[in-house]
């Protein structure tokens, strides 16, 4: 019987709850834009932003630009900044590894098994998540979308 030499993990929704983080972050962004004066319905705006993500990709960096332009005909930077700042704060507060991820990675690494991550996220975003979660020291290789 051959010994396992390596394990490869997906990042989003395997090591961390990406969709929960995204939900909280987008809802916070909508609230931030409303607090800045954008006159929109909170619930339908959340649904519309999710639809934009589904159309353009979950890692798209221009989603709020598209949303604001659809609402008022141009990108008002006051609303954009409010949305981005609220999004980032909520993202950081809700970016958490699933239970036992650290314990499992530590046990695998201590047993000499090489560990890797594969992600469909762009490199910068994947590495940001890995560092936010303090998991960077476990992985021998990280392979990303780009």
Model-predicted segments: where are they?
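Residues within well-ordered alpha helices
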Residues: 32, 67-68, 107, 129
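Short helix-capping segments at alpha-helix termini
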Residues: 35-40, 71-74, 134-138
């Amino acid at each position: 019987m051959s010994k396992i030499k390596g394990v490869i993990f997906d990042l989003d929704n395997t090591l961390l709850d990406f969709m929960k983080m995204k939900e909280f972050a987008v809802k916070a962004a909508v609230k931030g834009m409303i607090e800045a004066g954008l006159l929109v319905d909170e619930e339908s705006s959340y649904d519309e932003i999710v639809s934009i993500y589904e159309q353009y990709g979950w890692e798209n960096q221009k989603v709020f630009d598209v949303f604001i332009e659809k609402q008022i005909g141009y990108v008002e930077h006051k609303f954009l900044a409010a949305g981005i700042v609220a999004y980032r704060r909520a993202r950081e507060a809700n970016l958490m590894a699933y239970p036992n991820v650290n314990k499992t990675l530590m046990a695998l690494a201590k047993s000499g098994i090489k560990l890797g991550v594969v992600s469909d996220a762009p490199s910068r975003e994947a590495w940001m998540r890995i560092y936010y979660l303090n998991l960077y020291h476990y992985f021998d290789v990280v392979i990303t979308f780009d």
